[in-house]
Amino acid sequence: MAKSEVVNVALITGGARGIGRCIAATLAARGMAVMVADLLDTSECIEQIRGGGGKAMGVRADMADPAAAKEAVSRTVEAFGRLDILINNAGMHPQGRGWPPLREMELEFWERIVRANLTSTVVSSRAALPHLSDRRAGRIVNISGGGPWGPEWVSTYGNVAGRGPYMAAKAGVEILTRVLWEEEKDRGIAVTCLRPTIRIALDYEREEIRARHPGPEILMPHLLWLLSADPTEVGGRAFEFDGERLSAIPYLS
């Protein structure tokens, strides 16, 4: 693939399945070259994109590990010649209602959830920033987990008890969005955040769940808007999507 053919290049973390996979396919369908990074096998996602005529490569990487994140970014630039967009989607939310309360929670469990959801965003961003600032038009979109703030959380998981590490990590992602924007805006990097507050049915979930809830495709028009909007309009802000409207979250506006 000739590097001169590439116009926009995106690195999507946590892109092997779910929301990340949908993001990768959506961006590739619009002519972008995408690098899909995930701890999971990315081959199925890459084959899907290439089958539709898109440009894509995959890398198995723990994006909370600095060396692995740096390698993923380096492979992106080596393959496509540049890096314009980082989508921080990597994360983990153990399923079920059996999470322990904080007084009983093992510190290792807390650290594992925070590492997957918040540390990965920090580490991936640090690895990508030098290349994004080279473009002076770089974009970072952080995907926050909206469930704990949305009305469907209780009906799905019972309540927020026991969800401390996940909720703290995702709130941290939103605050980090503001911090990164303030630190990097003079280098031309726009940093923003998307928080879905509705239940999103993912491609690996049971059929009955996918029949009841919208898929990640419902988020894509809003993600594309965040990638194209004036940086002064979206930079440092988190936007929540409630299934009908996209609106700025007041405490980050």
Predicted region positions:
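C-terminal helical subdomain
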Residues: 186, 193-194, 209-253
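Catalytic loop of short-chain dehydrogenase/reductase
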Residues: 93, 141-172, 177-178, 182-185, ...
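A short, exposed helix-loop element centered on a Lys and neighboring polar residues
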Residues: 125-126, 178
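Canonical Rossmann dinucleotide-binding motif of NAD(H)/NADP(H)-dependent dehydrogenases/reductases
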Residues: 3-35
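The beta1-alpha1 cofactor-binding region of Rossmann-like NAD(H)/NADP(H)-dependent oxidoreductases
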Residues: 60-72, 107
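Active-site loop of short-chain dehydrogenase/reductase
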Residues: 7-8, 54-55, 82-83, 97, ...
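Substrate-binding pocket helix/loop in short-chain dehydrogenase/reductase
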Residues: 97-102, 106-111
